[in-house]
A protein has these predicted regions:
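N-terminal pre-domain/capping segments
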Residues: 1-102, 124, 135, 142, ...
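Acidic/histidine-rich catalytic cores of soluble enzymes
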Residues: 3, 24, 33-34, 128-181
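Active-site groove signature of glycoside hydrolases
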Residues: 97-119, 144-154
Length: 181
């Protein structure tokens, strides 16, 4: 039987909320999976993460994570400082997910989320920088057993991956079993 999941953003607009409340709500409603924004993991204490992890296990809810990468951490950026900062930021998130026994992250995490403030006639350089970054990030995902999924989105969310074909081409250029669409 297919497992069913729901994203906390169905109920919440902010990322800073009572995660335990929604784990229990998802369980009560018959869901098997609850997806959170990944960024708040960086602000949580380990004891709070332990509490969330325990409640999820008690309620038989698998936690998955998603991310719309802040442009300040754009791993496709031509600014090397921003790109390197993005790599470290995403590696820290994957490490925290590993601590939470999280197995899947998805979303726009291969470039800054949102349409760039400029026209992109040729995105190949951005794609190459993103791929270069992802080859580093995916090593951390492999170390923590995390599947790193890329999401094809419309041109107003990213110019890097807009079609299923582009998503497949992207993951095929990363030598890892831990990257998916």
């Amino acid at each position: 039987m297919n497992r069913l999941g729901i994203f906390t953003n169905f109920w919440e607009r902010n990322w800073n909320f009572d995660h335990i409340k929604y784990i229990k709500k998802a369980s009560r409603l018959g869901f098997d999976i609850l997806e959170f924004q990944a960024q708040p993991l960086l602000e949580m204490t380990l004891s709070h993460m332990d509490e969330i992890k325990k409640v999820a296990a008690d309620e038989n809810i698998e936690l998955t994570y998603s991310l719309g990468l802040d442009p300040r951490y754009d791993v496709s950026s031509s600014d090397e400082k921003i790109r390197q900062g993005g790599i470290l930021y995403l590696q820290r998130i994957v490490e925290r997910m590993g601590y939470m026994n999280g197995k899947i992250i998805s979303g726009v995490s291969y470039a800054g989320w949102g349409a760039p403030g400029y026209i992109v006639d040729d995105k190949s350089a951005m794609v190459e920088r993103s791929l270069k970054s992802m080859r580093e990030i995916i090593k951390t995902a492999e170390d923590y057993g995390v599947i790193y999924c890329v999401e094809a989105v419309n041109r107003f969310e990213s110019c890097i991956i807009n079609t299923a074909r582009e998503a497949l081409d992207y993951i095929n250029q990363i030598d890892s079993r831990n990257i998916a669409v």
